């Protein structure tokens, strides 16, 4: 089977969630089947596996409407796009499109790196579900990363196509920390500082944890930082890192007592999986997607209760609790692997090929 992966959503500086998802799947697929990829910028190759590639137009350009004509000439057995926006006019190949989550219907703020006209279209697009249905129904099979999103897609009737889970996963090759070594009195938050992320409640909980340091790792605007600094309780220690490298992120996680996320809404929660894979327990808000991802490797609390968050941290201090929580975290993270996701994608690809052939012959 020759799988062509649309890697044009790969960043040129550092991975974001979509970029890492695509690159990791390409690497795992290439070990299993003939794999090639589409790019639109040579700089993307620095963050992608060494597989054959073809350079085409940007997925954000008007030429996207005609990209299928270029892909037709490559004669792939099946095409996988880690987004749902790939142009399909005139396509003559089986296609899998991806919807990661429905978070932007609740919180429609577009990513800042998008051009202004695209940001406007983004907001309009997320005001109703019918545009999503139009995009997804162009595929033969639709992929998503979680059972939670699959359920939401069914609830909103977003597609008539089969929906298959091709999950996210932590990066390979990371050795978990020693569960019997005492953790540092530190807590980690990795993620944006949008209001729904509820970082204020985490900061408020530090009032009851004066012996801990809260590390806020992500990049943050000066205005948002000033807002959060203003609510740091007296005696609490909160460190704003303003962005960290991959190595710095891992080093801080390896020392910490726990990773914390009290988000009220989430698309997936990759930092939870990353933390658990290193043996660092997670304290998370009690929402469905975190229940699915965190499983037995997380402690769940009311996202509106700073006291419940602080109590969960103190519970980890009890004799024998943290070492067992660390082992539970590693076991839970082990349920998510890129090998498993690649196998699921190959199964979805075979299904897409059969459905495409059936539709071409008028049987579906």
What does each model-found stretch correspond to?
Residues 1-364:
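Carbohydrate transferase catalytic cores enriched for Leloir-type hexosyltransferases
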């Amino acid at each position: 089977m020759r799988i062509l992966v649309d890697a044009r959503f790969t960043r040129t500086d550092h991975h974001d969630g979509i970029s890492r998802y695509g690159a990791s799947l390409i690497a795992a697929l290439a070990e299993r089947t003939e794999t090639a990829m589409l790019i639109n910028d040579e700089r993307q190759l620095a963050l992608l596996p060494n597989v054959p590639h073809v350079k085409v137009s940007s997925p954000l350009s008007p030429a996207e409407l005609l990209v299928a004509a270029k892909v037709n000439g490559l004669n792939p057995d099946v095409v996988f796009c880690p987004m749902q926006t790939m142009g399909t006019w005139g396509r003559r190949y089986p296609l899998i499109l991806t919807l990661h989550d429905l978070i932007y219907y609740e919180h429609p703020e577009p990513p800042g790196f998008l051009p202004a006209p695209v940001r406007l279209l983004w907001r309009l697009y997320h005001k109703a579900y019918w545009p999503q249905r139009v995009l997804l129904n162009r595929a033969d099979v639709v992929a998503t990363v979680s059972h939670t999103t699959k359920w939401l897609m069914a609830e909103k009737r977003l597609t008539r196509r089969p929906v298959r889970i091709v999950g996210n996963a932590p990066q390979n090759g990371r050795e978990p920390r020693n569960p019997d070594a005492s953790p540092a009195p530190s807590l980690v938050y990795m993620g944006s500082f949008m209001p729904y992320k509820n970082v204020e409640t985490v900061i408020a909980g530090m009032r009851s944890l004066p012996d801990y340091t809260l590390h806020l790792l992500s990049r943050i605007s000066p205005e948002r930082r000033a807002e959060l600094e203003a609510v740091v309780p007296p005696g609490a220690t909160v460190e704003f890192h303003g962005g960290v490298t991959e190595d710095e992120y891992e080093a801080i996680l390896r020392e910490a007592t726990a990773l914390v996320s009290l988000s009220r809404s989430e698309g997936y929660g990759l930092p939870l999986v990353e933390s658990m894979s290193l043996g660092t327990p997670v304290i998370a808000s009690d929402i469905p997607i975190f229940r699915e991802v965190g499983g037995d490797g997380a402690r769940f609390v009311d996202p509106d209760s700073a006291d419940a968050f602080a109590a969960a941290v103190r519970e980890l201090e009890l004799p024998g609790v943290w070492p067992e929580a660390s082992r539970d975290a590693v076991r839970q993270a082990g349920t998510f692997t890129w090998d498993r996701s690649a196998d699921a994608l190959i199964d979805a690809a075979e299904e897409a090929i059969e459905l495409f052939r059936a539709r071409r012959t008028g049987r579906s």
